[in-house]
Amino acid sequence: MTRSLKKNPFVANHLLEKIEKLNMKEEKEIIVTWSRASTIIPTMIGHTIAIHNGKEHLPIYITDRMVGHKLGEFAPTLTFRGHARNDNKSRR
């Protein structure tokens, strides 16, 4: 279910403050965050945000096509290591 249009998109306050400060300075630096639930808004475009995936922070460059999505969508938490090998040969 989508979020009500009456409500604003969720963005963590600390993240919003950091982005506004960088926009006023017109500087580019990596913003480190654990807030995977924050929605990408147009003021974030052009910034690099390091999103925590549970183990490390992955730097993600924000483009205009990402607006409206959540930050966590771009930092996968699980790595697929392949299916279990078939051990029929070792059983013989």
Swiss-Prot record:
Signal peptide: none
Plastid as UniProt keyword: yes
InterPro entries, A to Z: Ribosomal_uS19 (IPR002222), Ribosomal_uS19_bac-type (IPR005732), Ribosomal_uS19_CS (IPR020934), Ribosomal_uS19_SF (IPR023575)
Keywords: Chloroplast, Plastid, Ribonucleoprotein, Ribosomal protein, RNA-binding, rRNA-binding
Entry-linked Gene3D superfamilies: 30s Ribosomal Protein S19, Chain A
GO cellular component, one term: mitochondrial small ribosomal subunit
Cited function: Protein S19 forms a complex with S13 that binds strongly to the 16S ribosomal RNA.
UniProt protein name: Small ribosomal subunit protein uS19c
